[in-house]
Amino acid sequence: MITVIDVETTYQKNKHNGFDPSPFHPDNKLVSVGLESGFGNEYYFTYHSEKVSEGCFETIQERLDQTTLLVGHNLKFDLMWMLEAGFKYSGKVYDTMLGEYILNKGIRKSLTLQMCCQRRKIGMKDDRIKYYMDEGITFDKIPADLVEEYGRNDVVITKRLFDSQMQDFKLPANKDLIKTAKMMGEFLVVLSDMERNGIYVDLNVLEKVNAEYTAEKAYLTQKISKIVYNKMGDTEINLSSPEQLSWLIYSKKPLDKANWAKIFNIGVDKATGKSKRRPQLSINQFRSLVKNNSEPVYKTSASKCLHCDGKGVIKRIKKDGSPYKNYTKCSECNGDGFIYHKMAKLAGFNQVPKSVYDVSESGFRTDKITLSKLASESEGELREFLDAIVRYNAIDTYLSTFIAGIKDHTDSHGMLHPKFMQAVTATGRLSSRDPNFQNQPRGKTFPIRQVVKSRFTNGKILEIDFSQLE
C-alpha cells in the first residue's frame, strides 16, 4: 500500500529569531498526522489545544504497518518526527521534493510544495494558515478545523505531485533517473538515522577553543589597528570593505568607478552570464591607464567638528527661533563628528598592481586568494600586515561559522543534530546547515575537531573519507 504522509508540529523561536521545528527540541510536539492511502484521506490530532483523536497512535501505526511505500514532501522531516514520536516504519520511501530535484536535472528551481505544484498546475497549498504563522501562533493553537483543512490539502496535492512525477519518470529521457530516485530514497533513510543519532560535542572543550581564538582575534584587531593608524593617519578603514582595504594596500582609488569598470572591462557579460574578458595590455599601457584614472590617497588628521561639537548631529532652528524636535545629521562633518584634513604624506603601503587581473570594480582586488599570494611575495611591514589580515579573516570565519554554529545548535546535554540536505547543490553533493558541518578546517590550523567526542565511555571517533565518491 502506498501511503502519503504530512505532519504538523509546534516550533520554538531560536537565538536568531528564526523558527526551530526540530523533533529534537524538548519543547516541540507532534500536533497532527495526515494520511492518504487505501483507507482514504485521514487526519489525526496527536496534540492540540482543542482536540486529540482517540486511539490515533494505534490507528496510525496500523496504517504504517500496511504501508509498502511512504511518500511525502521533504519526507525526512516527517519521517524523523514520526520515529521520534515512537512510531515504527522500516519500508521504502519516496520524497516528492527529491523527485522534483532529480527531474530538474541540475537546473535550479524552487522545491517548495507550493512551487512544485504550481509549475505542474496540479493544485495550490492552502495559505490561510500564513496569518497565524506570521503572528507566531503554533499549530497546536491554530483552530483545529483550519489545521485539518490545511493538512488534508497538503496530503492531496502531495499525492498529485507524486503521480505527476511517476508519469515523468516513464518518459524515455527520464527512465534511468528512477534508479537515482530509489537510491536517494535509501540515502534519505540513512540521513534520518544520522540526524537522529546526532553528534556528541564536548561543551567544555568548545568553550576553551572559543576563548582561545576570541583572545587571538582581539590581539590581531589591536595589531592591525595600530598598523592602519600608522599608514592612514586618522582615516578609519573598514577591513570588511574590499574598497577601503584597496586604498590601504595600493594607496590609490578610481576617479570614477563606472568609467574604471568600463576601461578594464569589469563585470558580467549579460549575454553569456560569464565574466567579461579583460583587455590585453602591455605593462606600460596598464600603468598609464591606472595613473590617468586614479587618484592618490593621502593620510589625514582629524579635528573635532565645531559645528556639531563632535556629536555628528545638530538641532535645526525654526523661523520662530525654537529648535526642531528631532536631531539632523551635521552637514559639515557628514555625521562623523570630525573634520578630516588631508596631509601631504601618501597613505597606505603604495603597493604597485601588476596587471589588469589585479583590478576590481572598486579599485584593486583584496580577496582571500589575492591577499595570501601578495603576502607570500611581500616582506617587512606589508608582509606583517597581510599575514595578520589573512589570519584575522580566517579566525573571524572560524568563530562565526563553526564555533558559533556548533554552540547555537548544541543542546545542554552536548548533543548536536546537524541537518543534512540532498537537494541544494546543483551537482547532487550533500550539504548541511544548523550548523554547517561540512568543510571543517583540517589539520592543526584550527582545532574544531577536538570538540567532537564519542558519547560512549572510552569510545573512539572513526573518520572515513571516500575521495570523489560521486
Task: Give the ranges of each region predicted by the language model.
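Conserved "right-hand" nucleotidyltransferase catalytic core of DNA-directed polymerases
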Residues: 1-9, 13, 27-34, 119, ...
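Conserved beta-strand scaffold positions in the cores of enzyme catalytic domains, especially
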Residues: 2-4, 42-44, 93, 461-463
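Cytochrome P450 core scaffold surrounding the K-helix E-X-X-R motif
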Residues: 12-16, 44-46
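A short acidic (Asp/Glu
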Residues: 14-16, 80-85, 248-249
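Short alpha-helical segments and helix-capping/turn motifs at coil-helix boundaries
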Residues: 18, 55-62, 176, 446-449
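Short consensus segments that form the blades of beta-propeller domains
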Residues: 21-26
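Active-site-proximal helix-loop-helix substrate-binding element of RNase H-like nuclease domains
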Residues: 28-35, 39-171, 183, 292
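Short glycine-rich phosphate-binding loop at a beta-alpha junction
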Residues: 68-74, 236-238, 465
